[in-house]
């Protein structure tokens, strides 16, 4: 397959746009990077890209959850369950005996983009509005949360 044909085979690519911002710089930067990783999914490097994506999702979820917990976000447990459900869906997809094909890569990209946009524009945006509307400035809270990995998602995929 030629490079031109390969590029035509990537119909479900969604670019980051400012409309996806939730108002928390660290989270917005992490979301932007997630879109970049999803966009990079292709058959030639799928295993490497999926590994990198999972590692980054572990870090992002951990950071986001730490912010929620530290700030006393009332919907923290609910949000945590959404992350766990996502992890289970990804585990099911990756646990399949099917090998990687162009169609399967497209299916994964479509699922990830749809989930990311839906999650960011509803649940993460709700958190962003809640946090930024609080009388206590959110900047110190965000700076206190060091990037880390762990939790349910890390255990599910054998990450440390």
Predicted segments with their positions:
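Small-residue-biased structural context
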Residues: 2-160
């Amino acid at each position: 397959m030629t490079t031109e044909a390969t590029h035509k085979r990537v119909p479900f690519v969604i670019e980051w746009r400012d409309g996806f911002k939730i108002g928390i710089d660290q989270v917005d930067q992490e979301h932007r990077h997630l879109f970049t990783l999803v966009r990079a999914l292709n058959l030639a490097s799928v295993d490497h890209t999926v590994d990198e994506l999972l590692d980054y999702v572990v870090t992002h979820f951990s950071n986001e959850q730490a912010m929620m917990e530290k700030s006393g976000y009332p919907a923290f447990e609910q949000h945590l369950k959404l992350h766990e459900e996502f992890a289970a869906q990804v585990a099911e997809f990756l646990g399949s005996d099917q090998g990687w094909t162009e169609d399967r890569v497209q299916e994964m990209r479509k699922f990830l983009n749809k989930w990311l946009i839906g999650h960011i524009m509803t649940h993460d945006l709700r958190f962003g509005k809640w946090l930024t509307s609080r009388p206590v400035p959110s900047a110190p809270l965000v700076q206190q949360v060091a990037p880390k990995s762990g939790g349910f998602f890390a255990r599910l995929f054998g990450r440390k």
